[in-house]
């Protein structure tokens, strides 16, 4: 049964490098994800790590409980129970992580563990109950849960109480001082293709869609010169996959490139909305899709960052491997069998170059991954604003959206706020209603806040960026939109940039102010991330570089 919701996704959030940490890889990788297990080292006694009470399979076949134990633990001394039943654990000597299942074969199909069988007298309630671990009748640990979502784990620790099996729980990763290159679209499409063309060893390519032939040309050329190329895309984008993309993916596969798509019954995330590439020891993170209207430079206003900070690149590569090397990543040749594809024209407009790529010194960079860690980080950034907040978004999910509420709270404490939304036909009416409400609220409460719809004036076709600039020196660049769908359903990355140099601030400002006040050359540039919800997941990443002298 698919978890996808049709209205979810006008955006493209996945990859914004913003705050992400080296997190565990999915089950089956060298390091297991915190999805199923906290740190196993240093456990003073047996503990419940997670429970899986509501399997997707009919009849809830495959319920399991994960525990951790000290080395050489005699499991026969322990029992597991709920509100109705207590069952003895197998008489085995075990260490570290142990998976206990009423149907080991079904559980083994989800995990790389060798589950131990327990009596099926223990049936976990979907509506919730306590799960109790006891030793010789004495309770030593307890995990409570309510309203178990289908196919998700209740975890004892981490950033979310519920998580899809195999989903990651990555911490925020911070990079030290260095230099990044910031660029705007449609002004500088060559940054993306030139980055791919420079590859000597590897390209790890992540996206929501891929329909730009120029990008495909560089991927094939890289493979021809023996560069390792891996591609990961969403398997079921809103509106369906296009014939153009299917043709490109056939071509990449024929060139020997490893192409995978995410989706299917075991999908950990409703969408893979990332937009990034790791080229050798550099990472490119953008707000735009790999298509003509996006990174191809033929339409959308967007932002991007290129960095070679080792911690950031390494963490993003780990995220890529975690997303690619699990069971919901399907080879393109397998996925395309029996599929139908949609026709869609490619954007072909041209626009002037107003903003050229610029190198910027960074004091610090943080990588965020959604749904793992991005929401709380972004709320903290907005909550700590003292001077200004500039927001540029395709759309916003409504008046009660958490980032909107945090921004209103900032305005109430005297922070000057500007919000610029897309005027594209598919979101204009909804955005205008929100703009009117925000301005009315600002007028009624005498808040330093103003909201507008963008007027492209020939500089671009539409806003597709997802950006926030705080206090003039911190920008978030990534694929996360400020709408409810993206907060709840996608996997993404984001990159946050902070600059205390006037020249650096100029580099990150021009793109927004040119749309806010055409007579003044003061635009800010940035992009934001999204939030995680227990019932819906979207894969995104974001980068937050703190730029300074």
What are these regions (language model features)?
Residues 1-13:
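N-terminal Sec-pathway targeting helices
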Residues 74-85, 143, 285-288, 476-480:
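Catalytic Cys-His active-site segments of thiol-dependent hydrolases/isopeptidases
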Residues 58-61, 86-157, 463-465:
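Solvent-exposed beta-edge/loop recognition patches
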Residues 71-72, 91, 105, 112, ...:
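N-linked glycosylation sites
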Residues 27-85, 123-125, 147, 174:
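A structural motif detector for short, solvent-exposed N-terminal "entry" segments of globular domains
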Residues 23-50, 56, 152-255, 270-272, ...:
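Charged, low-complexity intrinsically disordered terminal segments
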């Amino acid at each position: 049964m698919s978890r996808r919701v049709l209205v979810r996704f006008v955006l493209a959030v996945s990859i914004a490098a913003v705050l992400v940490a080296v997190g565990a890889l999915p089950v089956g990788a060298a390091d297991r994800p915190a999805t199923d297990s906290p740190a196993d080292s240093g456990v003073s006694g047996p503990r419940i790590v997670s429970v899986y009470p509501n399997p997707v399979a009919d009849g809830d076949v495959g319920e399991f409980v994960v525990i951790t134990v000290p080395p050489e633990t005699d499991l026969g001394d322990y029992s597991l129970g709920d509100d109705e039943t207590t069952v003895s654990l197998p008489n085995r000597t075990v260490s570290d992580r142990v998976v206990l299942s009423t149907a080991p074969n079904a559980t083994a199909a989800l995990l790389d563990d060798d589950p131990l069988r327990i009596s099926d007298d223990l049936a976990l309630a979907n509506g919730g109950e306590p799960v109790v671990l006891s030793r010789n009748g004495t309770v030593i640990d307890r995990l409570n849960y309510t309203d178990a979502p289908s196919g998700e784990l209740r975890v004892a620790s981490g950033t979310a109480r519920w998580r899809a099996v195999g989903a990651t729980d990555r911490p925020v990763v911070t990079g030290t001082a260095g230099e990044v290159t910031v660029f705007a679209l449609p002004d500088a499409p060559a940054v993306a293709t030139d980055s791919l063309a420079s590859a000597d060893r590897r390209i790890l390519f992540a996206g929501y869609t891929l329909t730009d032939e120029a990008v495909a040309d560089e991927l094939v050329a890289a493979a021809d010169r023996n560069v390792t190329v891996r591609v990961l895309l969403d398997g079921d984008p809103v509106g369906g996959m296009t014939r153009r993309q299917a043709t490109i993916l056939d071509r990449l596969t024929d060139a020997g490139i490893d192409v995978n798509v995410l989706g299917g019954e075991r999908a950990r995330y409703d969408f893979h909305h990332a937009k990034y590439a790791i080229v050798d020891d550099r990472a490119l993170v953008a707000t735009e899709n790999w298509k003509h209207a996006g990174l191809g430079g033929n339409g959308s206003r967007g932002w991007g960052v290129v960095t070679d900070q080792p911690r950031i690149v390494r963490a993003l590569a780990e995220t890529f491997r975690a997303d690619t090397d699990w069971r919901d990543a399907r080879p393109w040749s397998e996925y395309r069998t029996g599929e139908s594809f949609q026709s869609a024209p490619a954007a072909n407009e041209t626009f002037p170059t107003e903003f050229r790529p610029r190198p910027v010194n960074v004091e610090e960079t943080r990588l965020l991954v959604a749904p793992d860690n991005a929401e709380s980080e972004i709320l903290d950034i907005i909550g700590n604003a003292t001077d200004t907040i500039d927001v540029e978004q395709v759309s916003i999910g409504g008046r009660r959206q958490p980032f909107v509420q945090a921004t209103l709270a900032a305005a109430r404490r005297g922070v000057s706020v500007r919000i610029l939304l897309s005027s594209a036909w598919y979101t204009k009416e909804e955005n205008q209603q929100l703009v009117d409400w925000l301005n009315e609220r600002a007028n009624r409460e005498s808040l330093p806040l103003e909201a507008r719809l963008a007027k492209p004036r020939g500089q671009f076709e539409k806003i597709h960026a997802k950006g926030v600039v705080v206090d003039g020196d911190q920008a978030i660049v990534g694929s996360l939109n400020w709408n409810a769908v993206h907060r709840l359903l996608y996997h993404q990355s984001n990159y946050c940039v902070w600059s205390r140099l006037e020249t650096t601030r100029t580099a990150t400002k021009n793109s927004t102010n040119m749309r806010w006040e055409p007579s003044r050359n003061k635009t800010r540039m940035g992009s934001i991330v999204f939030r995680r919800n227990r019932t819906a997941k979207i894969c995104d990443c974001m980068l937050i570089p703190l730029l300074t002298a």
